[in-house]
């Protein structure tokens, strides 16, 4: 018994580890060799690259904190080799086909919030 919820329409890459009590929604893509810590929530629209580490309590691709959001199909992308530390929240884009993007080789430090429609470049540290 895994104690995880993994929607059958999600895509999880080879050699990716999901620790207990994580939630993976529909329309989620997680790359190869990732590590998803316990109590991580990944909502619809997440596109996660290879070799990404997401630490306990993080919430990825939550609906944006924007009153004009009307349920459009939007995404969050996290580039290869990035690390998302404990209790980070990342909101997806606001308008149709918009995205919140974190580049490759980034470190998003604990308790950070990445708001809707933000673009974080390559190899950056967000405090």
Q: Where do the language-model regions lie?
A:
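Active-site beta->alpha loop and helix N-cap motifs at the rims of alpha/beta catalytic domains
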Residues: 67-70, 91
């Amino acid at each position: 018994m895994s104690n995880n919820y993994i929607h059958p329409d999600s895509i999880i890459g080879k050699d990716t580890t999901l620790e207990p009590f994580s939630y993976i929604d529909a329309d989620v893509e997680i790359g190869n060799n990732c590590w998803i810590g316990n109590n991580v929530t990944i909502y619809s629209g997440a596109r996660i690259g290879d070799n990404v580490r997401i630490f306990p309590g993080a919430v990825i691709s939550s609906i944006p904190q924007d009153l004009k959001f009307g349920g459009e199909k939007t995404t969050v992308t996290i580039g290869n080799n990035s690390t998302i530390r404990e209790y980070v929240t990342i909101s997806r884009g606001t308008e149709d086909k918009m995205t919140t993007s974190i580049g490759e080789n980034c470190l998003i430090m604990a308790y950070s919030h990445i708001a809707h429609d933000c673009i974080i470049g390559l190899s950056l540290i967000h405090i």
